[in-house]
Structures are given as structure tokens and as C-alpha cells.
Design a protein with these regions (language model features):
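Nucleotide-activated donor-binding/catalytic signature segment of Leloir-type glycosyltransferases, i.e.
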Residues: 292-325
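Aromatic "clamp/platform" in nucleotide-sugar-dependent glycosyltransferases that forms part
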Residues: 345
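A short, well-ordered alpha-helix in the C-terminal region of glycosyltransferases
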Residues: 391, 398, 405-419, 431
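Carbohydrate-associated surface elements
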Residues: 204, 224
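Conserved acidic donor-binding segment of nucleotide-sugar-dependent glycosyltransferases
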Residues: 377-378, 382-389, 398-403
Length: 440
């Protein structure tokens, strides 16, 4: 099967733009082969939707995959591996600005962060971006069995591809119609109806679509991880030294990009109420906020607020901001953790819950997160009331005060995580792809 993927965030991020790469190497053939570059010039995605899709490609028997993603000033085409080619879409500054405002408006409404007053020019930029993606995807029409489009940034792509080819869409963020304005809710629903099949990550999202009057085919699948990809565990002592983690520290780990939606502030307020515990916040900015991405300062502003909060609560010596960590360092942090948190008020799923379980760690998860559907209180972890740092602190104490039960919960969690292993979910996804191929 030949699959063409579309997502905003690419599977690879460069530390130099295309002109910088040309200046460094002189001549680069297009497509640019990653194996010909120094490893310091790029990094493969270590989180989110791109990481999930990379693991899917590794574990599936796809004959060939083409992936279209946003890549400002990136090389036009990059060869990641023999069966994976990435094609980058670039936009002018004005279009990027309008696009960011519109898609962040959707994001904020979906997560209950803020209402968005739609501005026609911002929508136009969003539509242009989706059109450019669809144009690139349609170049592969005769050599594609199914298009696989991912997330809210690409809502219009299915309607543009239209009846020319089968298109499957996975919507990864929350869909709670009651917290969205009618215009945004209806825009999302009508856009989804242009796809042959829509996949959502949780039962709650599927129920939300039904309440909103969605007329189409929708399926629920839990996002997936490859447990083998989490087997890279770096030098634990080196990681402890790097992040000033002592042998007697109880490590409370929260893995996620620096984003107000992740509510790291709730974790900081909770840790102030838990003695002899060190909160490790692992992650940097999203593609939108990172250098080499869209370079907004959302992550930087949030970091400064979090650091100020830690100082005000006198816990700055017990809160560690790691910034970007490699897969090996992340594995070491999971190994060191006594408990892993997911604190978002609202989140589509939260794969870090399953990652923690792969390492047989107990979790404490906000009830507003999709992965809370898999948490059985007192059995594989605990849930807490969103934004209630007192409740979170009590649940963390329950884990730390009963080490034998914590070990048992981690073991049960590992069994739960098998429901989200790529080997099982990829079979379901392949069946969906095959079901829409009639259009070819």
C-alpha cells in the first residue's frame, strides 16, 4: 500500500534553514538525504503526532510513504529513509501570521482556553495553507492508494481532494461541542464531513461528534506507541547529574511541551504541597513556538511564568526545566520517575500516560485528558479533578507513600498500555485504509 500523509508538524526539524545547509555543504542534491547530513543539523520528532506516525511507518508494510508538512525555509524534499520522502510547504510571512492566528483560535476553543472571533483574512491564510498542502498531495494522485490527513490544522484538505481519492482524517485534539462557539464547532464538523472516514482518539470525542450532529463515518481509536522505541535508556547517572537529581529525591515527572494547555503550573502548585519530591518538567516548545518551526514565543512566555511561579512558592530548587531531551535522556527520566503526571485541563489523549506504563510507572492524570479513559483509580494510577492542585498533591502523596502499591500499579499499567501498542492499532488503521480504497 502506498500512503500519502499530511500534517502540519514535520517528522524532522532542522537546526539550519536551507540556505544555511547549502552554505555548510556547498551542493546538496534534492531530495536531500538525511544520511548525508551531520546529525547536529536535524532531529527526528520525539513527540506528538509526527512521532506516532513515524512509529506507524516503521511497523507497517507500506510500500512507500510521501509526507507533506509545513517547513518554513526547509529543503523542498527530504529523504528520511528508503520508503519515506518528506515534502515541505513554505509560506510567506504574512500568510504564516494569519494561519497561526486562525489555527490557534481553533486550538484555544477546543481546549477551553479562549474564544476566537473569526477574522476573514486569517481564515484566508488558513485556507491558502490547506490549499498548498492539497496541491502537493494531489501531485501523487496516480501513485497513492490512500491519503492520511492529520489534525485540526488540515481540516480543509479533505474537501479540496474531494472525490478524486480516498482520504482518512485523524482529529487528535478534544472535541467538546459545548465549550466551543457555534461557528467554530460547525466549521470543524462540516470540514470533517468531507472526509471518507474520521478517526477520533477517545470515546468522549466520538460522543461529542454525535451530539454536534456529525453526518459521516467516524471511528474511535486510541493513539499508539511503539514500546521498542522507548527502549533507548541513556546513562541514568549522567542524567541525574545533568538535572541535579539526588539519590534520595522522589521524582515526579511531567513530559510535554511548554504550553499553557499542559498546565504545568498546576503541577508546580501541587509539588509545593509534597515534601521531599522533585518535579521534572521535560520538554521544550511545540513546532509553532520553536526555532526551526514557526518561531512564536508562546513557549518562552509560558516558561517565564512557570519559573516566576516556582520562585514565588519557594520551590525553584525542586522544579527542574529540562528543555529538549533526547530519546535516551527521556528514557532515563522515565526510569528514574516515581510517578508520572498529565496535568492538562483538557487534552485529546496524552500518550505520555502510556509511555509511563511502558516503564511500569504509576500515573496521576487529569480527568480532562483523553487517556483518563484508561486509568482505573487505585489500580493502574489515579485521576484528579482538572486544575485542582490540592487533589493532585494528595494523589501524588498516595503514590509516594506506598511504594509496594506503586510497583503493582505500574505492572497493571503496562498491561493496560498494550491496548495502545502500535502493532495492534496499526491493524485497525490498515483495515480503515482498505475500507476506503473503493474510490480508486
Amino acid at each position: 500500500m502506498k500512503v500519502s500523509i499530511n500534517s502540519q508538524t514535520p517528522p524532522v526539524k532542522f537546526s539550519l534553514d536551507y540556505s544555511g545547509l547549502l552554505e555548510k555543504y556547498g551542493v546538496l542534491e534534492v531530495p536531500v538525504d538525511l544520511s548525508s547530513l551531520d546529525k547536529t543539523d536535524f532531529q527526528l520528532s520525539v513527540g506528538g503526532v509526527p512521532r506516532m506516525l513515524l512509529q506507524l511507518i516503521d511497523k507497517s508494510d507500506f510500500e512507500f510513504v510521501r509526507w507533506v508538512a509545513l517547513g518554513p525555509k526547509y529543503p523542498p524534499i527530504v529523504k528520511v529513509k528508503d520508503n519515506l520522502m518528506v515534502y515541505f510547504v513554505s509560506l510567506d510571512i504574512a500568510t504564516i501570521s494569519g494561519y497561526i492566528k486562525f489555527k490557534e483560535g481553533i486550538y484555544n476553543e477546543a481546549h477551553g482556553l479562549a474564544k476566537y472571533n473569526i477574522k476573514p483574512r486569517e481564515y484566508l491564510s488558513y485556507a491558502y495553507y490547506n490549499w498548498y498542502c492539497a496541491q502537493r498531495l494531489l501531485r501523487f494522485l496516480d501513485d497513492t492508494d490512500v491519503y492520511f490527513v492529520n489534525d485540526f490544522q488540515q481540516l480543509l484538505v479533505g474537501g479540496i481532494i474531494g472525490p478524486s481519492a480516498p482520504v482518512v482524517f485523524w482529529y487528535h485534539i478534544p472535541f467538546i461541542p459545548e465549550i466551543m462557539s457555534p461557528r467554530i464547532r460547525d466549521f470543524i464538523v462540516k470540514s470533517m464531513e468531507a472526509y471518507d472516514v474520521v478517526i477520533v482518539s477517545t470515546k468522549a470525542c466520538l460522543e461529542g461528534l454525535i451530539r454536534a450532529g456529525f453526518r459521516g463515518i467516524a471511528k474511535q481509536m486510541y493513539p499508539f506507541i511503539d514500546p521498542e522505541a522507548l527502549s533507548k535508556v541513556g546513562d541514568v547517572q549522567a542524567v541525574k547529574d545533568k538535572f541535579n537529581i539526588r539519590d534520595d529525591d522522589n521524582v515526579v515527572l511531567l513530559v510535554g511541551r511548554l504550553d499553557p494547555m499542559k498546565r504545568q503550573d498546576v503541577a508546580i502548585r501541587a509539588i509545593a504541597k509534597v515534601d521531599n519530591a522533585k518535579l521534572v518538567l521535560a520538554g521544550n516548545g511545540s513546532f509553532t513556538s520553536s526555532r526551526g518551526g514557526l518561531a512564536t514565543d508562546k513557549a518562552g512566555m509560558w516558561y517565564r511564568k512557570l519559573a516566576k511561579l516556582a520562585r514565588e512558592l519557594n520551590v525553584e530548587d525542586r522544579v527542574v526545566f529540562t528543555g529538549y531531551v533526547s530519546e535516551e535522556e527521556l528514557g532515563a527520566l522515565y526510569s528514574l520517575a516515581n510517578v508520572v503526571l498529565l496535568t492538562s485541563s483538557v487534552e485529546g489523549f496524552g500518550l505520555t500516560t502510556c509511555e509511563a506504563w511502558v516503564f511500569k510507572k504509576p500515573v496521576v492524570v487529569s480527568k480532562g485528558c483523553g487517556s483518563a479513559e484508561l486509568v482505573i483509580d487505585g489500580t493502574n494510577g489515579y485521576t484528579f479533578v482538572p486544575n485542582d492542585y490540592d487533589d493532585l498533591a494528595e494523589k501524588v502523596k498516595m503514590v509516594l507513600n506506598d511504594s509496594e502499591k506503586a510497583i503493582w500499579m505500574g505492572e497493571v499499567g503496562f498491561e493496560t498500555a498494550k491496548r495502545c501498542f502500535v502493532d495492534s492499532v496499526s491493524k485497525e488503521l490498515k483495515a480503515v485504509f482498505e475500507s476506503v480504497q473503493y474510490k480508486k
